[in-house]
Amino acid sequence: KVAEYSVQKTYGKLLTLLEKAFNKKKPLFALPMYYPLAYSKVPVADGFAENRQKQVVGLIRILFLKRFESSARAFESSCQQLLRKVMAFVQVNSTTKHEQTAFERWRIHQEELLGEVQKRQNQLFDDGVEDDPEQDEDVIPEEMLEAAAVLDRELFDVPQILSESLQDLNQLAEFLNELRQFKPSQDDKLRALIKLLKTDPVLKKHKVMIFSEFMATARYLAVELEKAGIKGIDQIDSATKRSRSDVIRQFAPYYNGMTSKALADKDQPETRVLIATDVLSEGLNLQDAARLINYDLHWNPVRLMQRIGRVDRRMNPETEKKLIKDHPDVKAIRGTVEYWNFLPPGELDELLNLYKRVSNKTLLISRTLGIEGKKLLRPEDDFAALKDFDHQYEGEPTVLETMHLEYQRLLAAHPDLGARLEA
C-alpha cells in the first residue's frame, strides 16, 4: 500500500531552493575539499584516485537528496554537519590575510545562524544528558580542525578551492536559514503517518514496525509520535546505548523466547510501535508484528526486501499458539503481512529527476506501489529472483550495522556472553 504525502506542503520554499541548487553547473555543492584533484595545478597521474574523489562528491549529493526526502530533521542534521566540516577546511587553508578576512566576514555575517546551529546540533542528538556548561561553544569542534586537510599551494589552486568552498557555505546557510522556520506542524509526511497510525483499524491497536534509513528521522518520529499521543513507542538506531536484545524482546517477545507476562514480571514495558533504522533490517526475528511502514522513498529495493523479511518470515506453530492464546485479538491478522510505502506522487518526478542529475541513473518508481521498477511487491514477484539484482543497487549494511547484527547472533548463541562482557 502507498501512504501519500506532499513534499511541497512540508518544505514550501525550501523545495524550490533545492531544485535551484541542483540545477547549478556543479549540482547542489561543489565540495572541493572532497575533490581537490579537480583543482590540480599539475597533470593528475592517478586516474583511479581522481575518479574515487569524483564518486565521493556524487555520493554526498545523492545522500543529501535522500535525507531531504526522508525528513526535514535528517536534511538539517546533514547540512549542519557539512557546514562544520567545510568551515574547518576553509579555516585551516585560509593562510593569506585576504582569505582570512573573507572567512571572518562570512562568520560575522552568519553569526546568528551559527549560534542556532550549535543549539540545534545539541537538540538533534540529545540523549537526555544535560549540556555541559563548560562545553566549547565554537561551532567548529577542535577535532574537525585537526582532521581538515591542509592543501599544498604548489599542487592545488587553493584560492579557487576556497572561493567555491565559501559558495558551498552560502548554499548551506541558505538551506539552514529556511529550515529555522520549519515546524513539525507543517510536516505533511509526519501528519500522514500520524493519521495512518490513528485511523487504520489494525495499526491503531496492533504492533507495527516503522523503518527509516536515517537516525535523525527515526529520533524525530519517536518524539513527534509520542507528542501526538501514540502509545507504546520505542526507537532504536546504530547509536542506541540500551541493550539491543532488550529492545527487540520488548517488541517481539514471543519470537525471542519471552512472553508478555514475562516482560511484565521483569517490569519491562512491551513495545507496540518500534521505529528503527536498517540496523534491524536483517537477521532478526520480529514476527510478533505483522505490519510494517517504510517511511522513506525506496531508492534501493534490495534493502526493502530485507526490511519486509523481518516480519514476513516462517511462523513457528507453537509460538503462534502461545501468542494467540495470550492475545486472542491478534488471531485475525496472524498469517498475513501488510506494509505501507510513503510516496509523494505530486513531486515524485522532480525528485527522480534530481536523482538522475547527480547519479546518471534513472529510477522508475511505481506510483501505486512506491517501489522501483517491477521487481518487488506484486503478488507474482519472485523474491528469491530479486537477489540476482543485488549487485545493481547500493546500500549494503554498514560495517557498524554488520557488527551489531553479529553481536546479536553471538548473544543468542551464548546467553551468558553479555554478562561476561560487562563483568
Where are these regions (language model features)?
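Generic hydrophobic alpha-helical scaffold/packing signal
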Residues: 194, 305-308, 359
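A generic secondary-structure signal for well-formed alpha-helical elements
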Residues: 72, 76-79, 83-86, 90, ...
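Conserved RecA-like P-loop NTPase helicase motor core
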Residues: 226-347
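A generic short-segment signal for beta-strand/edge and adjacent turn/coil regions
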Residues: 177-180, 202-204, 260-264, 308, ...
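Hydrophobic, Leu/Ile/Phe/Ala-enriched alpha-helical segments that form helix-helix packing faces
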Residues: 22, 197-200, 225, 251-255, ...
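Helicase motor interdomain insertion/brace
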Residues: 1-242, 252, 270, 277-284, ...
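C-terminal accessory region of SF2 helicases/translocases
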Residues: 315-423
